[in-house]
Regions:
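Terminal-region recognition feature
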Residues: 1-206
Length: 206
């Protein structure tokens, strides 16, 4: 069993036991002649909401300050999704880091979590992992005017365009393709995600 597979089993165990969504897996240092490089491995396993994402961003900030020579950040992801705006914020945060970003789907990357996965320069999935894309939804409670509903509809359309743009940028399919897929609601296997260009590599069990 390779290290990536062992990591996936560890996360499955932690989720079953209800443990915290944030883990610093490993900080690996390597000496390269005159300088030292650091590879940081961390997990995001939980809903994409403000509390979880803020904690995640703060932890990465702490790690990058502690290890300024970091050359790579690996993010292991298993998430049911959540808030699109918060996911986009994390996407941009990861993109702005001055190191290689590697995202790994260790179980399921659904809904808004796909935006976080897309931030990876290297995007990896385990063979049995999956991705789920669907239409933007919003829960509304209370009384609303026509203008209120129209405003919400415009916001949902804008978020749909935002997600489709991000996925088109990292894949070999255009925005229209991803919008159609979102409208239908579609579960993607690792192999299908690789065919679409969303995944760069599938890590086989060894």
């Amino acid at each position: 069993m390779n290290r990536l597979t062992q990591t996936a089993f560890m996360f499955a165990r932690d989720l079953a036991q209800g443990r915290a969504i944030l883990h610093v897996i490993m900080v690996a240092k390597q000496e390269k002649k005159d300088n030292q490089t650091t590879d940081i491995k961390i997990s995001f396993t939980g809903s994409v909401n403000e509390e979880n994402v803020r904690a995640f961003i703060n932890e990465i900030k702490n790690l990058t300050e502690k290890f300024p020579n970091g050359t790579a950040l690996t993010v292991y992801i298993s998430s049911p999704g959540g808030n699109v705006d918060i996911a986009v914020e994390l996407f941009h945060f990861l993109k702005l880091l001055d190191c290689t970003i590697r995202t790994v789907n260790i179980s399921c990357v659904n809904s808004a979590a796909i935006i976080i996965f897309a931030a990876g320069t290297e995007r990896i999935s385990l063979p049995c992992s999956s991705f789920y894309v669907h239409s933007i939804t919003k829960n509304l409670n209370g009384n609303f005017t026509t203008n209120d509903l129209l405003r919400e509809a415009r916001e949902m359309a804008a978020n749909t365009d935002k997600v489709a743009t991000i996925l088109a940028d990292v894949s070999n399919k255009n925005k229209s393709y991803w919008k159609r897929l979102m409208q239908k609601g579609c579960l993607l296997t690792s192999q299908k995600a690789k065919e679409l260009g969303l995944v760069n590599d599938i890590s086989e069990f060894k």
